[in-house]
Amino acid sequence: MRINILSEDTSNKIAAGEVVERPFSVVKELVENSIDAGAKTINIEIENGGRTLIKVLDDGYGIDKDDIEKAFMPHATSKISKLQDIYSINTLGFRGEALPSIASVSKTTLKSRTKENEFGREISISGGSVDYIKDCGTNIGTHIEVRDLFYNVPAREKFLKSTAKEASSISDIVNRLALAHSEISFRLINNGKRVITTYATDNLIDTIRAIYGKKICDNVISFERHTDLVSVHGYVGNAEISRGSRNNQSIFINKRYIKNKLITAAVENAVKSFMMINKFPFFIIFLDIFPEFVDVNVHPTKSEVKFQNERDIFKIIFDTVHEGIRNSLKESFKVEALKEEEDKLFDIKEDVITKNEIKHDDKIDGYIKKDSFPVPVQIPIDLKRPIENYDNSTKENKDRSFDDFREKDIIKETSQEKETYDIITNKKAKFPELRVIGQFNNTYILAESFEELYIIDQHAAHEKILFEKYREDIKNKGVSSQILITPSVVELLPEDFIYYDENKEVFKNAGFVIEYFGDNTVAIKEVPLFLGKPLVKDLFLEIIDNLKNMGSGETSEVKYRSIATAACKSAVKAYHELTHDEMKTLIQDLRFAEDPFNCPHGRPTIVRLTVTDFEKKFKRIQ
């Protein structure tokens, strides 16, 4: 087969296939050109989903009349002049491919004038061939019309979606561009009807309200952080506006709209602790980073980027979003009485019982205590030898299950000791001290404070307490393990084994002792003590799946969170009757948790109802 040299017309149409996928691609390229030209107002008009007309008008710098024809030549650009420039790009466009690609598959007319010229210049191109160039009267800025897109490439036109879907895609990209550039006024008209209007503002929340409406605006949480590497800011939605898809997620790098799995994973992992599973959060995130640390020259449409410091970027985003949500939850549970309670904590009575005075046969049913002293409370079993079927093998506990043993033989602590320990650890209560009223349906604890009723999900609350305890133990490398009498042998798929092998140290620090058994098979010999009697194989595979979904770039801290989340299944269950003291202790532990308001899986742990809420329900007030 002989090698042929393609004609300029053919090569331009092939190149157009990379840049001009659909009508929304044309809108994106033209609007980005307007933004690069310093426009303050951009008007877009489309007809029939952009098939028959795409019109973009701006009030930017305009194109010099002597450069009008050059603008439609391949690789002609005003934004870079040498190869090194692509590594420090500050503009949205730079390759000089958009206009020639668009003009090669449509009928295009462009008018433009700069402030230095009294008259503008107009050029018309059909299918890549120049029809005419002439002087014209026009305002400062650029006015471009693209008609009959793909008229000369029927194969491409055939694969366009319905008019409504193409119009929706255009609306979506204009929304993203408006979010990225709230300092610019945007207007989109579809078949003569105005569908998007934003006004120039220095307040992003105003643009969010204009695009998404009041409900979205009222349910977003702001976050912001500045580091030497990157500045991060934006908004993330609460559970009220989470969706079943990622359509309402927007990522901007130096104001360029992109899609990036690393950033998406960082935000979603940060939100995961506060939101129900099977939902995706609404978020708008901006990253400002030095151009030399990010490569946008990865994809023809510049929709993907690569970072030099992926792990650092992930951690900064994760921490920033997580802290923003946590602070918002704290604000919603702000209590005036906390200061008074803090003062009471330091009024320690002399008759506080010491650790040595507590009898080990004191019992608390159904609930694992959080650390009551600097030394972790341990179940009194011999870790030097295996545990037959996880049961204590002594005669005294012969007829008792491990779960009963774990739940009933934990050291009892007094409220005075709890206060002393909180002083030692310098932990602050996140909600007021509550008076326990009782238990509803053996699942929810009812408690009150002042004129407020608190409803606590006992399982979700205990999960969060265990989660934070386990995570802290991992951080301090203080996880206690229990030996399995019969190691659990797990045969992994090759892909799963790769993820295990990559994270061996993570498993080790989390309290798992695992040995290689040959041929992608491992033997799990020890598991974290607090798990009780877990289904070892199922838990291990669940953790592997979580790590796979996270990818390989995430930090160990995030991986430990994932393991802790999967491991917290030993929490007290729903429909389990608790004593009054157990309920008090659970609430007290939850008060001093770092993030007490959501379980590790995102469900709320506590709901607050005020007297006003009840009076509205009973129609006492409107």
UniProtKB/Swiss-Prot annotation:
UniProt record, GO biological process: mismatch repair
Gene3D superfamilies: 3.30.230.10, Histidine kinase-like ATPase, C-terminal domain (3.30.565.10), MutL, C-terminal domain, dimerisation subdomain (3.30.1540.20), MutL, C-terminal domain, regulatory subdomain (3.30.1370.100)
Signal peptide as annotated in the record: none
Keywords, alphabetical: DNA damage, DNA repair
Pfam families the record matches: DNA_mis_repair, HATPase_c_3, MutL_C
GO CC annotations on file: mismatch repair complex
Keyword DNA damage: yes
InterPro entries attached to this UniProt entry: DNA_mismatch_repair_CS, DNA_mismatch_repair_MutL, DNA_mismatch_S5_2-like, HATPase_C_sf, MutL/Mlh/PMS, MutL/Mlh/Pms-like, MutL_C, MutL_C_dimsub
CDD domains documented for this protein: HATPase_MutL-MLH-PMS-like, MutL_Trans
Cited SUPFAM superfamilies: ATPase domain of HSP90 chaperone/DNA topoisomerase II/histidine kinase, DNA mismatch repair protein MutL, Ribosomal protein S5 domain 2-like
GO molecular function per UniProt: ATP binding; ATP hydrolysis activity; ATP-dependent DNA damage sensor activity; mismatched DNA binding
HAMAP family: DNA_mis_repair
Function text: This protein is involved in the repair of mismatches in DNA. It is required for dam-dependent methyl-directed DNA mismatch repair. May act as a 'molecular matchmaker', a protein that promotes the formation of a stable complex between two or more DNA-binding proteins in an ATP-dependent manner without itself being part of a final effector complex.
UniProt record similarity statement: Belongs to the DNA mismatch repair MutL/HexB family.
Protein name (record): DNA mismatch repair protein MutL
